Amino acid sequence: MMRFRHVVAAIFALAGVGVTGLPAVAQEQIGAVSTTFRLMSPNDKVVIERYDDPKVENVSCYLSRAETGGWSGAMGLAEDPSRFSIACRAVGPVTMKGKIPTDKKGEVVFSEDTSIMFKELRISRFYDTQKNVLVYLVWSTKLIDGSPYNSISVVPLN
């Protein structure tokens, strides 16, 4: 089922059609720096994006990630590297908008395709009830030497 969704998303992306219910993209790109100069095509870069948690008011996650340039990158055909960092912060009084799962599986809060097929970047939220904190995990669905790259950030709840 998951692969079918990726195939459908890829077909619609190539056709230039948006589909409701597919993974959300960054709500705001904060900035970017070029890392590799390419004379005739877009440069490779590191982008900084902000994602606001849809179920937790006033929690924003800032993600830096590598983005492949070149003509294939510009057309969305290149695979972005699985390297990223995350920092989530309370930017005001934290309010839960709905029930936050407390199980060990967590909840995928954001998801973004990072290649045309079968590779996603995901941000999952976990609730540590003992310490009263939200833990955000960014990870890639692509396995590197048997496990995905990942990074975490913790937001204390008062």
Question: What kind of feature is each model-predicted range?
Answer:
Residues D52-P54, D128-K131:
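Short, ordered beta-strand-loop transition motifs
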Residues Q27-S85:
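N-terminal secretory signal peptides
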Residues S60-Y127:
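Mature extracytoplasmic domains of secretory-pathway proteins
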Residues I48-Y51, I86-C88, I123, Y136, ...:
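Generic structural hydrophobic/aromatic packing signal, biased to beta-strands
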Residues Y51-D53, A66, V91-P93, T141, ...:
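Generic structural motif
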Residues M1-I11:
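Bacterial N-terminal signal peptides that target proteins for export
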Residues T129-N158:
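C-terminal partner/receptor-binding element of secreted or periplasmic proteins
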Residues A15-V25:
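C-terminal segment of classical bacterial N-terminal signal peptides
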